Structure formats: C-alpha cells, structure tokens
Swiss-Prot record:
Red blood cells. GO terms for cellular component: blood microparticle; haptoglobin-hemoglobin complex; hemoglobin complex. Keywords: Heme, Iron, Metal-binding, Oxygen transport, Transport. Involved in oxygen transport from gills to the various peripheral tissues. It comes from Trematomus newnesi. Signal peptide: none annotated. This is Hemoglobin subunit beta-C. Pfam families: Globin (PF00042). Heme b binds at residues 63, 92. This fish has three hemoglobins: Hb1 (major, about 65-70% of the total), Hb2 (about 5% of the total) and HbC (about 20-25% of the total). The lineage of its organism: Eukaryota, Metazoa, Chordata, Craniata, Vertebrata. CDD domains: Hb-beta-like. Belongs to the globin family.
Length: 146
C-alpha cells in the first residue's frame, strides 16, 4: 500500500487524539448493538441483553480498549500492517473462528464513532484516509482466511 504524506499525517493525528479507553468501548458496543449477531463471539462476556447492558459491560469495555491498542500497532507499522497482524489473523481465523466480514462491520462502527468525536474536522479527505487505513487493517486481519 502506498501512503501519501497527507494520509500518514492524518492517521497519526487521528489516533493521537483518540482516548482509546473511551472510543474502543464505544465502538465495540455500537457493533454489538447494531449487528447483534456479532454477540455470538462474546458469549463469555455475560449480559449483552440490550444496549444499556452492553454499554455498562466491563468486558466489552476492556476488549474495546484492547482493539484500539491493537490498531495503534498498525498506526506505528503502516508500511507493514499485514505482517504486523499476521498472528492476530491466525488467532481470529483458526482459534476464534470469527467471520472476517465482522472486521469490516467493526471498522464501519469505528468510523462512525471517530466521525462523531471529530465533527466538522472529519472532512471527506480525512474520512478517505481513515477508511483507506481501516480497509488495509481489515484486509490484513482477513489474510489468513484466503
């Protein structure tokens, strides 16, 4: 993947301004509410009965933060995201058996959460860079499935 200077700077700027322990949980909670079938991967998380329960679930919060910290690894390794995520791809495909389409759903939820936080600063150009980054992440996580 070729990154322009603008794309690199934009991705680094976005992630430098995110509160991982707020945005991560909000993103995962949104995904679990909007796409309830994704809850099947989180059976050990306890009560996911409704949006309020999901939002207050400590395990959802913790895993959401873990996801954002995982994305931070991609930000720091933008030229080699595929290899950066090789082990995660194997884990999610072979051990956890996660449908790779769910990575795209989560990426879409993150885009919405980020857009809401950044407001008018999340211009079309910024969104294009962010979605390009997330598409590379999603592709890298799904690599083991091919």
């Amino acid at each position: 993947v070729e990154w322009t200077d603008f794309e690199r700077a934009t991705i680094k700027d976005i992630f430098s301004k995110l509160e991982y322990d707020v945005v991560g949980p909000a993103t995962l909670a949104r995904c679990l509410v909007v796409y309830p079938w994704t809850q099947r991967y989180f059976g050990k998380f306890g009560n996911l009965y409704n949006a309020a329960a999901i939002a207050q679930n400590a395990m959802v919060s913790k895993h959401g933060t873990t996801i954002l910290n995982g994305l931070d690894r991609a930000v720091k390794n933008m030229d080699d995201i595929t290899n950066t995520y090789a082990e995660l791809s194997v884990l999610h495909s072979e051990k956890l058996h996660v449908d790779p389409d769910n990575f795209k759903l989560l990426a879409d939820c993150l885009t919405i959460v980020v857009a809401a936080r950044f407001g008018s600063a999340f211009t079309g150009e910024v969104q294009a860079a962010f979605q390009k980054f997330m598409a590379v992440v999603v592709s890298s996580l799904g690599k083991q499935y091919r």
